[in-house]
């Protein structure tokens, strides 16, 4: 059977089953590699029980096979989405499975000013609050004059 399974992205090996954070709109390439095994393993990507790709590249000289999952544009629904890499070279044994979740930065969906429901007057104090929602991590709000 295959001995090792490793998932990596453009930044290197994935640790603790979650990618480093990617910006909304960025592209992401995940590579799942299997080493050893005779014959070399078939490698496939799954999400929620559905096959995404089972296109496997074989490198016999290095005793390795791999499959690449490319997401051209990350969207909000990819946040913490779990993708599974399955590695198998025999129907007699269950596949080796490695799961990876996608971490993301999300820009704010909305910024709103509160407290402007009356006319402003010179020399009179008015409190205005800026509320922001939909960002991850929470947005840093600053005021400029």
Language-model features, listed with the residues they occupy:
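Solvent-exposed loop segments of extracellular immunoglobulin-like
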Residues: 36-49, 134-145
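Conserved Ig-like domain signature around the intradomain disulfide
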Residues: 28-30, 41-43, 79-87, 91, ...
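Extracellular beta-strand/loop-rich beta-sandwich domains predominantly from IgSF
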Residues: 17-22, 55-101, 115-119
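A short beta-strand segment in extracellular, disulfide-stabilized domains
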Residues: 21, 27-34, 125-132
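Flexible inter-domain hinge/linker segments at boundaries of tandem extracellular adhesion modules
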Residues: 1-16, 46-53, 62-63, 89-90, ...
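Residue-level recognition of well-ordered beta-strand positions that form the cores
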Residues: 31-33, 46, 70, 86, ...
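Disulfide-stabilized cysteine-rich extracellular repeat microdomains
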Residues: 10-12, 27, 37, 50, ...
């Amino acid at each position: 059977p295959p001995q090792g399974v490793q998932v990596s992205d453009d930044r290197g090996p994935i640790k603790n089953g979650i990618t480093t954070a990617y910006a909304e709109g960025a592209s992401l390439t995940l590579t799942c590699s299997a080493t050893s095994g005779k014959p070399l393993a078939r490698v496939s990507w799954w999400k929620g029980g559905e096959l995404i790709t089972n296109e496997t590249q074989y490198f016999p000289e290095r005793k390795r096979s791999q499959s690449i999952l490319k997401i051209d544009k990350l969207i909000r629904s990819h946040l913490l989405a779990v993708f599974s890499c399955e590695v198998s070279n025999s129907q007699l044994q269950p596949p080796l499975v490695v799961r990876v979740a996608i971490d993301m930065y999300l820009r704010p969906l909305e910024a709103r000013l509160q407290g402007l429901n009356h006319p402003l007057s010179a020399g009179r104090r008015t409190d205005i609050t800026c509320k922001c929602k939909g960002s991850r991590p929470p947005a840093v709000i600053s005021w400029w004059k």
